[in-house]
Amino acid sequence: MKNLVILTGAGMSAESGISTFRDAGGLWDRYPVEQVATPEGYQRDPALVINFYNERRKQLLDVTPNRGHELLAELEKNFRVTVVTQNIDNLHERAGSSHIIHLHGELTKVCSSRDPYNPHYIK
């Protein structure tokens, strides 16, 4: 069986209705990255950061994987597929893909950077 590595980014999720970060009118136009996507931003205003990501999680409830997600999952019938994605949603998983690497993490899986007993603890 052949191996396939597939790279995906914002366009894949945008087709499902997920807001992008960088496009005109995207999330970074409304929220400076320093305020909601850095440890310093969290230290300054944890409520803003938590609300920002909770809104992203809420958006996931209203969208479904698109045909592109489904086609990638179907490739697993004939290939060993690894999807490497910049997206932080779980649409690849929901479409049925089983080997996904989220380069920037995933909204539905969070961990504390302050919990030394957490296996994902960041020092």
Go through the PLM ranges and name each one.
Residues 1-123:
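Conserved catalytic core of sirtuin-type NAD+-dependent deacylases
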